Design a protein with these regions (language model features):
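N-lobe entry segment of adenylate-forming
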Residues: 1-58, 62-77, 81, 161-185, ...
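Conserved AMP-binding/adenylate-forming
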Residues: 53-56, 70-115, 262-265
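Conserved AMP-binding A3 loop
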Residues: 59-61, 208, 217-243
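Conserved structural elements of the adenylate-forming
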Residues: 64-69, 197-204, 213, 232-253
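Conserved AMP-binding/adenylation subdomain of ANL enzymes
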Residues: 106, 240-259, 267-310, 322-324
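AMP-binding/adenylate-forming catalytic core of the ANL superfamily
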Residues: 131-136, 309, 424, 429-430, ...
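Gly/Ser/Thr-rich phosphate-binding loop
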Residues: 185-191, 306-310, 324-388, 400
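Conserved C-terminal "lid"/linker of ANL adenylate-forming enzymes
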Residues: 502-507, 517-522, 532-594
Length: 594
């Protein structure tokens, strides 16, 4: 981009965000190599510690020895090029070994963390013969798989196969112990991880697959928190497309930073790419902590004092509410701090910024934008503008983001709301359903394949992306219900007594294609809805913005680490249907009396 050139009005052509990238970063290239080759650059010394897992340091030499054994064992079990390997593991070292081993043999990992029925469905579709599970896999679960799938080998990975229980604090041990069923899965079709590895060590006929960085490597289902769960497919090429653009994030030229990963499972693309592989590729020490209870993340932060810790709004809420965090606890150990997973409204941002200031963390709290389909992150916090009103940063250096008229390929100009679309090296190969892929991945007139996200937002003349809502939600009578702007209006009104608030948008059962807004508020002690209801309605300038009903919640509810809007929406619809049924019965009764 020529920074002195006049803007054409088309972000995809102007790329105004490039002015925020220093020259040294503009030279970043996306190499055409495997994930293993990309990581090997950081593994020149096999004695360097790559990961720490519950008291055990794991060197790069150990990592690649384990990968070799795992790849051989997979071939012994008959896993071939093109096969899908269902892996139902937490973020443990064995997951990384399996990912790199799958790459060596030309297979792909299949990850899902939904209901038992949905997980079984994924295995059925894959026609998998081998799956990997933890040792807290239950008898009831394995019997369901035996009845409904063609799996003939269940490889059982102990939760602490690579860790030391004695190194775990008591609260961690309790959290792990709570996962185990009364009757675990056992049988002639099960195999322990150690036996699996021994089988690989003995095998001498290993034949690696031809290198193909564009074949499927990682398949993961979306969480289903914003709609039906879909299988997203990525290759080594698309994974490295994200890693190469991000591996300077959270780094330091003065010391080797640590990177703590708590709880979040590798069933999420962002976890694998931006939270497991990124720190390894960036030369940081990855600390895996998958079995901590979400309400104990405050204790783990104090125990490890990490330099980097991928946060989500749920984690932020836990540490903010913590009664165990000393008032003088110093968070200056953090090198960068921000949150992804879902949008923050202005009230949430003010709350967390005040909290960080109280704990000597003088970093700028940032928010980013991304998706499973985008390979994780799509933006970075490079622009010096306030993180307010949906500001999620600027496109990554080799990615292009622009705004299009929804349902079309017509690019819009700056400050005009529309569908957020992107093109770049991190975009997925597609979904497992061709019709869904064709809708999401479209070749535009510029010859590039663009990902149509379904998200609504706009871009400023500086190239800063602002998110507004997910999809179009018109209200009958006029007006579009955009979640983030609605929440920010209430947040900026700073109504006395409100600690937190969020909207849930529900289909209008009387007007097809239209929607209705409901507001949930967390109130401070001593306040009731009567104290805030009129002020809420008064601050929303247009009638269509005002909620049908306002509910109170003791705290923000979460599902799959996101605000549980789907669950609350179902509750609203169920309550509405009950009221209709009751009204119908009353009407019938009145007619009988008459």
């Amino acid at each position: 981009m020529n920074e002195n050139a006049m803007l054409t009005g088309k972000p995809s052509i102007d790329r105004p965000w490039m002015k925020f990238y220093p020259e040294v970063l503009r030279g970043i290239q996306v190499p055409a190599c495997t994930v293993e080759q990309y990581l090997s650059v950081r593994a020149a010394d096999p004695n360097v510690i790559a990961m720490h897992y519950y008291g055990v340091d794991i060197t790069w030499g150990t990592v690649f020895r384990k990968v070799d054994v795992t790849a051989r064992a997979l071939q012994v079990l008959g896993v071939k090029q093109g096969d899908q390997i269902p892996v139902f593991l937490r973020s443990v070292p064995e997951f990384i070994y399996l990912l790199l081993a799958a790459e060596r043999i030309g297979a792909s990992l299949l990850c899902r963390d939904n209901t038992l029925e949905e997980n079984i469905e994924a295995v059925q579709k894959a026609n998998a013969k081998v799956i990997f599970v933890h040792d807290f896999f239950s008898k009831a679960e394995i019997e369901a798989y035996r009845e409904q799938t063609n799996v003939n080998t269940y490889v059982i990975v102990p939760a602490l196969e690579s860790g030391d229980r004695a190194a775990m604090p008591v609260y961690l041990q309790h959290s792990l112990d709570a996962l185990y069923p009364d009757v675990p899965a056992r049988g002639s079709d099960t195999m322990m991880w150690a036996d699996f590895c021994n089988m690989g060590q003995r095998f001498r006929g290993f034949v690696p697959a031809p290198v193909n960085i564009d074949r499927p490597l990682l398949r993961a289902y979306t969480s289903g928190s914003t709609g039906p769960s879909k299988q997203v497919i990525h290759s080594a090429h698309s994974i490295i497309g994200v890693l190469a653009q991000m591996n300077f994030y959270g780094a330091s030229d003065k010391f080797r930073p640590t990177w703590l990963l708590t709880i979040l499972p590798p069933a999420l693309i962002a976890v694998v790419v931006s939270m497991m592989l990124l720190p390894l590729a960036g030369g940081m020490l990855l600390i895996l902590d998958p079995f901590v209870d979400v309400y104990d993340v405050d204790l783990e932060m104090m125990r490890y004092r990490p330099n980097n810790w991928p946060l989500i709004p749920m984690f932020v809420e836990v540490i903010r509410r913590s009664k165990r965090l000393p008032a003088d606890y110093d968070m200056s150990h953090m090198l960068a701090i921000g949150a992804g997973c879902e949008a923050f409204n202005n009230k949430q941002l003010r709350n967390v910024e005040e909290f960080l200031k109280q704990h000597n963390c003088n970093l700028r709290f940032t928010a980013g934008y991304g998706s499973s389909e985008a390979g994780s992150n799509a933006t970075l916090p490079m622009a010096p503008f306030p993180v307010r009103d949906g500001n999620v940063g600027v496109p990554m250096i080799h990615s292009v983001i622009s705004i299009f008229k929804p349902g079309t390929q017509e690019e819009l100009t700056y400050n005009t709301p529309g569908e957020i679309c992107m093109t770049g090296p991190g975009v997925m190969l597609g979904y497992d359903r061709p019709e869904a892929t064709a809708k999401a991945l479209q070749v535009h007139a510029d010859g590039k394949t663009w990902l149509h996200t379904g998200d609504i937002g706009y871009m400023s003349e500086d190239g800063v992306l602002y998110t507004m809502t997910r999809g179009a939600s018109p209200r009958f009578g006029g007006g579009d219900l955009m979640v983030q702007p609605l929440e920010n209006i209430v947040a900026d009104a700073d109504i006395k007594g409100i600690k937190d608030e969020f909207f849930v948008i529900v289909p209008d059962d009387e007007h097809e294609g239209c929607f209705l807004p409901y507001l949930y508020v967390q109130l401070k002690d001593g306040y009731t809805l009567d104290d805030v209801r009129d002020k809420i309605n008064a601050c929303l300038p247009e009638r269509y913005m005002r909620p049908v009903e306002i509910f109170t919640v003791p705290e923000r509810p979460f599902f799959h680490f996101k605000t549980n809007r789907i669950g609350l929406s179902k509750e609203i619809i169920a309550k509405r249907n009950q009221q209709k049924e009751k009204a119908k019965r009353n009407s019938f009764a009145d007619g009988c009396i008459a």
